[in-house]
């Protein structure tokens, strides 16, 4: 499975797909993260084994990240469109190489209802770093499309940061 940094038309297609999934901007840690300003890692269509010439826009997975807060790189969005095939794991594993030298930590946020994501990240070495009670409630003032209830019928209220030291 090949992970690559998106450029040109592929970057535009990756950002458009993420915006379709998450809306624009992503609201996290009491700030707006415009996906249009993020870099993106991509995995092509894994059913085709990432053959050269993958058509832009046919993604098995995408990871948007920001280097704005050096020495911490922020994962702004992660989507594996082909579940349980190692796509998310491959994207996260490739990220340290792509953020470059001088970065000491990767950080991401998820919501309190996203128990599957919490398990996924912790099994890959990420650790819990912060809890922001009411952060999602505050985010709804900027982005009203955030649902009130999420996975497993849990109310979505809080954000949880996870970090991975490099």
Regions found by a protein language model. Give the residues of each.
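Extreme N-terminal starter segment of soluble prokaryotic enzymes
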Residues: 1-3
């Amino acid at each position: 499975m090949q992970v690559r940094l998106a450029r040109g038309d592929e970057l535009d297609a990756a950002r458009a797909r993420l915006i379709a999934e998450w809306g624009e901007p992503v609201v996290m840690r009491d700030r707006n993260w415009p996906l249009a300003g993020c870099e993106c890692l991509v995995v092509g269509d894994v059913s085709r084994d990432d053959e050269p010439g993958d058509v832009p826009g046919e993604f098995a997975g995408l990871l948007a990240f920001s280097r704005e807060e050096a020495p911490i790189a922020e994962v702004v969005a992660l989507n594996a469109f082909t579940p349980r095939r190692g796509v998310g794991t491959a994207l996260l594993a490739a990220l340290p190489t792509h953020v470059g030298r001088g970065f000491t930590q990767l950080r991401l946020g998820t919501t309190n209802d996203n128990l599957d994501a919490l398990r996924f990240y912790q099994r890959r070495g990420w650790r819990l770093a912060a809890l922001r009670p009411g952060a999602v409630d505050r985010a709804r003032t900027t982005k009203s499309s955030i649902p009130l209830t999420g996975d497993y019928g849990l109310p979505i209220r809080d954000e949880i940061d996870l970090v991975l030291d490099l």
